[in-house]
């Protein structure tokens, strides 16, 4: 008799929905679970990467200014004048039977021919470096295209440029996976997942080796001048190795241009990531207290070499990065720290023995 009366329900009116709470249920984590908690990964500065890509594209495209055209026209006119004067000297020497002058003309012709040949070779290698950027843009378009007929020829051209033989197991798996009903996006995606990782794995090994050598060299070397020369030499060697792996033959000017583009890309997008990666380890593992100053400098030099290799890999790679296949600086960071700590432990244990 003490229960309250329930409200009246009128069936002629629509039922009222009970309001649901907007709050989620409470979750309680144990102490063991809280230790293994890992924060979610955050995308790495899309704005900075976009600015870096725009700067690289602008640097790759030749600037067609008026002064450039005037200089090129003047050089062409000077070259034509030199050739004409050389032909006239040769004719006069032949008519007067001046064999000494004729020999000098022949030697000059050989020197000019060698110079023209080297200029043409350098221009062709520089054009090949620029062409790689256009191939990357074409691959990006094919990865978002539903057309048919271009993907297979494009991928076969990339395999030929990289020196991958037709009997290579990765290329054979790609041939077995594609069929006529697939569009260009699917064919290029299969190439990126089956064939391209073969070259990427070789480039990663080269980056790891060169970064480890830079780290150990800086950690044990007492001379700053020797350190600078060694790092510069090894970084240039690393760029040459990565370019060769991806089928790009570098000349003098193309090597300088690629090195400039890599440094430009690092200046745009690499500084904040490098500081974050180094700071993460120093704060979490207290490396500043465990390692010496030279060892810390070695880790910094190794990370810079790894960053240089990653950007050179990105510029020489014929395909854009897909999903999460881009190498992370943190992967090389952990490897460098482990190798350096192992080397320091061996050096400390050897005098005791």
UniProtKB/Swiss-Prot annotation:
<keyword id="KW-0997">Cell inner membrane</keyword>
<feature type="topological domain" description="Cytoplasmic">
    <location>
        <begin position="91"/>
        <end position="99"/>
    </location>
</feature>
<feature type="topological domain" description="Periplasmic">
    <location>
        <begin position="121"/>
        <end position="212"/>
    </location>
</feature>
<protein>
    <recommendedName>
        <fullName>UPF0283 membrane protein YcjF</fullName>
    </recommendedName>
</protein>
<feature type="transmembrane region" description="Helical">
    <location>
        <begin position="70"/>
        <end position="90"/>
    </location>
</feature>
<feature type="region of interest" description="Disordered">
    <location>
        <begin position="1"/>
        <end position="35"/>
    </location>
</feature>
<keyword id="KW-0472">Membrane</keyword>
<feature type="topological domain" description="Periplasmic">
    <location>
        <begin position="1"/>
        <end position="69"/>
    </location>
</feature>
<feature type="transmembrane region" description="Helical">
    <location>
        <begin position="100"/>
        <end position="120"/>
    </location>
</feature>
<dbReference type="GO" id="GO:0005886">
    <property type="term" value="C:plasma membrane"/>
</dbReference>
<dbReference type="InterPro" id="IPR021147">
    <property type="entry name" value="DUF697"/>
</dbReference>
<keyword id="KW-1003">Cell membrane</keyword>
<dbReference type="InterPro" id="IPR006507">
    <property type="entry name" value="UPF0283"/>
</dbReference>
<keyword id="KW-0812">Transmembrane</keyword>
<feature type="transmembrane region" description="Helical">
    <location>
        <begin position="213"/>
        <end position="233"/>
    </location>
</feature>
<feature type="compositionally biased region" description="Basic and acidic residues">
    <location>
        <begin position="1"/>
        <end position="19"/>
    </location>
</feature>
<dbReference type="Pfam" id="PF05128">
    <property type="entry name" value="DUF697"/>
</dbReference>
<keyword id="KW-1133">Transmembrane helix</keyword>
<feature type="topological domain" description="Cytoplasmic">
    <location>
        <begin position="234"/>
        <end position="353"/>
    </location>
</feature>
<comment type="similarity">
    <text>Belongs to the UPF0283 family.</text>
</comment>
